[in-house]
Design a protein with these regions (language model features):
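Conserved glycine-rich cofactor-binding loop
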Residues: 20-21
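Short, small/polar-rich loop/turn modules that mediate ligand/substrate recognition or access, typified
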Residues: 184-188, 243-245
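Conserved mid-core segment of classical short-chain dehydrogenase/reductases
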Residues: 77, 100-116, 158-164, 203-207
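Short C-terminal tail/terminal secondary-structure segment
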Residues: 2-8, 100, 104, 211, ...
Length: 256
């Protein structure tokens, strides 16, 4: 498959956490289409992860799968070591893995349990993995880290889910800005803040939520995982070489 010269990532070695489905999968595919070799991380969806890796291999890219439960602190070093051993280097690390409080098994947990899960996986995972991979990238003399936030975090959203996600995603967005200062100039760090993106929850959302998305979004439609992936491709490329420490909304111009 030919690769466009714009945002060309040929030869880049990448790991995307939580990339067996949804936004993570879309990012992995987009970066592979840009020429990158991509490691697919998953927690328990082995078959889905292997299907993504196979899809990337059909594009002519190298791709393997790595499993790690990011709720367990002891798995972090192992995941990082496996990634560097597989590629010999890592040019791009995307922290996409997160707890699904809306459609997954965690949806049945109480408020405190949900908060604990988010802090363990979304926040601690992003912070500690970013710092560890960032240190190695500094030693390489180059690298790019991309995190995933949420556009409503800094504006606020009603309800338990709004409170919980705002807590975790605001932490990630603030951390991204500070980590950039620590790792520059060798390593760039940015964060994408998605708006209403049509993933598993959105596909089954009620008519009330469907109308709310249209009402709050000037584009009057859901965004797609591919919309996030295209921004990820740009931010990971040399075309974004002077962009770091930024939290960029991809939300159809949503206002609330």
């Amino acid at each position: 498959m030919s690769v466009s010269s714009f945002c060309n990532l040929t030869g880049k070695k990448v790991l995307v956490t939580g990339s067996s489905s949804g936004i993570g999968k879309a990012i992995a595919i987009e970066l592979a289409q840009a020429g990158a070799d991509v490691l697919i991380h998953y927690r328990k969806s082995k078959e889905a992860a292997e299907m993504v890796a196979s899809q990337l291999q059909k594009l002519g890219r190298k791709s393997e799968t790595l499993s790690a439960d990011l709720a367990c602190l002891e798995n972090y070093e192992s995941l990082l070591n496996q990634a560097f051993q597989t590629w010999g280097q890592l040019d791009i690390w995307v922290n996409n893995a997160g707890v699904d409080l809306l459609t997954g098994s965690e949806a049945k947990l109480d408020y405190g349990q949900k908060l604990e899960k988010l802090l363990d996986v979304d926040v601690r995972g992003t912070v500690l993995l970013s710092r560890a991979v960032g240190e190695r990238m500094q030693q390489q003399g180059r690298g790019c880290i991309l995190n995933i936030g949420w556009d409503q975090s800094d504006r606020g959203m009603e309800g338990a889910s709004g409170e919980l996600f705002s807590t975790s995603k605001n932490a990630i967005m603030g951390f991204s800005r500070s980590l950039e200062v620590s790792l520059a100039p060798q390593v760039r760090v940015n964060c994408i803040a998605p708006g209403w993106i049509l993933t598993a929850w959105g596909e089954n959302a009620s008519d009330v939520w469907q109308e709310r998305v249209k009402r709050e979004t000037p584009m009057q439609c859901w965004g797609t995982p591919e919309d996030i992936a295209k921004m990820a491709r740009f931010l990971c490329s040399d075309e974004a070489a002077y962009i770091t420490g930024q939290v960029i909304n991809v939300n159809g111009g949503a206002v609330r």
